[in-house]
Amino acid sequence: LGVLLPICLLLFPLTALPLDGDQPADRPAERMQDDFITEQHPLFDPVKRCCDWPCNAGCVPCCF
């Protein structure tokens, strides 16, 4: 088992598996676009790097 596992990982690396596509890490361009939209939001505080209350879906993360 100690030899079989490394051989299988070399032949079939986990990175070769298809991603599900619904995670933010799977969509870096959209993630960057979301950050840009947040920074342009009127409730966004650039010093604290969060949104003042009342926060809504257009501005994340909220300052607590």
Swiss-Prot record:
Keywords: Cleavage on pair of basic residues, Disulfide bond, Hydroxylation, Secreted, Signal, Toxin
Protein name in the entry: Conotoxin Pu3.4
Expressed in which tissues: Expressed by the venom duct.
Residues making up the propeptide: 17-49
Sequence similarity: Belongs to the conotoxin M superfamily.
GO MF annotations, alphabetized: ion channel inhibitor activity; toxin activity
Top-level taxonomy: Eukaryota, Metazoa, Spiralia, Lophotrochozoa, Mollusca
Residues that bear 4-hydroxyproline: 61
UniProt domain comment: The cysteine framework is III (CC-C-C-CC).
